[in-house]
Structure formats: structure tokens, C-alpha cells
Curated annotation (Swiss-Prot):
Organism of this sequence: Haloarcula japonica (strain ATCC 49778 / DSM 6131 / JCM 7785 / NBRC 101032 / NCIMB 13157 / TR-1)
Organism classification: Archaea, Methanobacteriati, Methanobacteriota, Stenosarchaea group, Halobacteria
A GO molecular function held by the record: transferase activity, transferring alkyl or aryl (other than methyl) groups
Subcellular location: Cell membrane
Membrane topology term: Multi-pass membrane protein
EC assignment: 2.5.1.150
Protein name: Lycopene elongase/hydratase
Length: 294
């Protein structure tokens, strides 16, 4: 499992027994850039120069979606999955913390979500719509009455929430939506990424009586579903720029590599934050090159 800079935080942050240490671990440091990264990409493509790239609003959005946004997203998930997580090996092996039923934690999770509403004071209308959509999907993915995560295919579709911070970041700078092909392509990518990450949870979810896209399709067919999502994402991104379409082909290629070499999916899953960080960095570097050199 590759080490990310965020992985080193566990050695320096307060112990899990403290409230701050627990909250930081609940926010999944290894996955911080899953929300914060799209902000960087969105802002990079919207900005006309370094001034906009490092504007106070852009920085505030990145900081929010890196930590408080993750506390909100994963906090809601852990609160409503407390019983199910008893069967989750990710909790048993210490890679993720288990919800401890602390009222202070619940209050902070709610406050982390409410904090996002402050951006409504400065975002354009489209940015506000995207922000509200992100908040709604973050809650209803895990919480009743919709609880998308327990409905095959809706769990996958709803995980487009991960790309909405990028839409918000783009709208915050440009005032309009990013290209539709970029949004649809990124949404399809997120669908594949979410479902791929659910493969290690197939047996625990079945034991807990949870229906997901992965439990419904089974492991073999889930690989094909992910490949389909990523091939479609590459195809759609091609209409934004062919380079983006080519870049996205790394994902179906990795699936065939995993199957061909026989890599344990439980191990491969933990490589993807690093892979996604590298791909996101390439997207960002392309934007910066265009910004600086045309």
C-alpha cells in the first residue's frame, strides 16, 4: 500500500481517544483529496491567472472540502452505519475508526455541514445549487429516508457527489458551469470509482443484509461495470479534449492489470487514493500550462 502525505498525519495528530484525534481520523485523511482535489481542478480550469487561482474564496473552498467537508460526509455515513460497520473489516483492522456514539461528535458533524452554507453568501447561483446538491447527496447517501447506499445503482449514481466540489470551485471563479461533457465524464468516473471501492465490502455488506451495486452484480460483473463506467467517462471526456479521454483510460487499464496479475482487491483498493491523486495532478498541471502558456 503506497504512503500518501496524509498517511503520516496519524503519527502527529492527537490520539484517537481525544475528540480532535477521533474527528480527524473519522474524516479519512487518506481520502481528503477526494473532495478537496476536485476543487483544485475546477478552480485551475476556471482561473485566468494566479490571482484567481489563489483567491480567498478558492482557498476557503479547498480548506473546507479537505477537512470539514469530509467530517460531514463520513460523519453522516458512520452515524447511520454504526450497526453495519460491526461487519466491516476496514473498521476491525484499524484503517478506519468506528462511530462511538458521542453526542459531541454528532453535533460537530452537523455543524460541519452547516458551515458549508456560509459559502451561499458569496457563490453565484449555480455554485449554490451545486453546493446544496452536494449537501443533499452527502446526507441521503447514508441517511433515511432515501439512503441511496442500500439501493443498487442509485448508490453508484449518487456518488457523483464527489465531483460537485469541482463544479462549485469552477463556478466560484468563472460564474458559470464547467463544460457539460466534463461534468458528465467526471460523474461517470465517480460512479466507477465508488463501485470499485465497494468490491472489498461485498461479503460484509451481504452479511449485514445491505444491497449495493456490487452485491447485486457480484465481484466479476462489478469489475465489468466499473470498466464500462470508466470507458464511458473517457469517451465523454474526449468531447472536452482528447487528452482527457486518453488520461481516463488508465482506469480500465488498471482493472485488466489487477485481474491479469491476480492482485488482491483488498490491497488494490488502498492504492487508488494515490492513483487518483496522480491523475488529478496531471489534470491540474494541464490547466496550469494552458493558463501560463496558452
Amino acid at each position: 500500500m503506497p504512503e500518501l502525505p496524509t498517511d503520516r498525519l496519524t503519527a502527529v495528530i492527537p490520539p484517537e481517544e481525544t475528540l480532535l484525534g477521533y474527528l480527524l481520523r473519522l474524516s479519512r485523511p487518506r481520502f481528503w483529496l477526494y473532495l478537496g482535489g476536485p476543487v483544485i481542478v475546477g478552480v485551475s480550469y476556471a482561473a485566468d491567472g494566479p490571482g484567481e487561482l489563489f483567491s480567498p474564496l478558492a482557498i476557503a473552498l479547498f480548506l473546507y472540502f479537505t477537512i470539514p467537508g469530509n467530517v460531514f460526509l463520513y460523519g453522516v455515513n458512520d452515524i447511520f452505519d454504526a450497526d453495519i460497520d460491526e461487519h466491516n473489516p476496514k473498521k476491525d483492522d484499524g484503517r478506519e475508526v468506528s462511530y462511538r456514539g458521542d453526542s459531541a461528535v454528532t453535533a460537530i458533524v452537523v455543524a460541519s455541514g452547516a458551515l458549508a452554507l456560509l459559502f451561499a453568501l458569496v457563490l453565484p447561483t449555480l455554485g449554490i445549487v451545486a453546493l446544496l446538491a452536494w449537501m443533499a447527496l452527502s446526507v441521503e447517501y447514508s441517511a433515511p429516508p432515501l439512503r441511496f447506499k442500500t439501493t443498487p445503482f442509485l448508490d453508484s449514481i449518487s456518488n457523483g457527489l464527489y465531483i460537485l466540489p469541482g463544479v462549485i470551485g469552477y463556478a466560484a471563479i468563472e460564474g458559470v458551469a464547467p463544460p457539460a461533457t466534463a461534468v458528465v465524464g467526471a460523474w461517470l468516473w465517480a460512479m466507477g470509482m465508488h463501485t470499485f471501492s465497494a468490491i472489498p465490502d461485498i461479503e460484509p455488506d451481504r452479511e449485514a443484509g445491505i444491497q449495493t451495486t456490487a452485491t447485486f452484480l457480484g465481484e466479476s460483473n462489478t469489475y465489468y461495470y466499473c470498466v464500462m463506467c470508466w470507458l464511458m467517462a473517457a469517451f465523454v471526456f474526449n468531447f472536452t479534449h482528447w487528452v482527457f479521454g486518453v488520461l481516463l483510460l488508465v482506469y480500465p487499464g488498471l482493472v485488466f492489470g489487477i485481474l491479469g496479475v491476480g492482485v488482491d482487491i483488498d490491497e488494490a483498493y488502498w492504492w487508488y487514493p494515490a492513483i487518483n491523486t496522480v491523475v488529478g495532478m496531471v489534470f491540474t498541471l494541464i490547466a496550469l500550462w494552458v493558463m501560463l502558456y496558452g
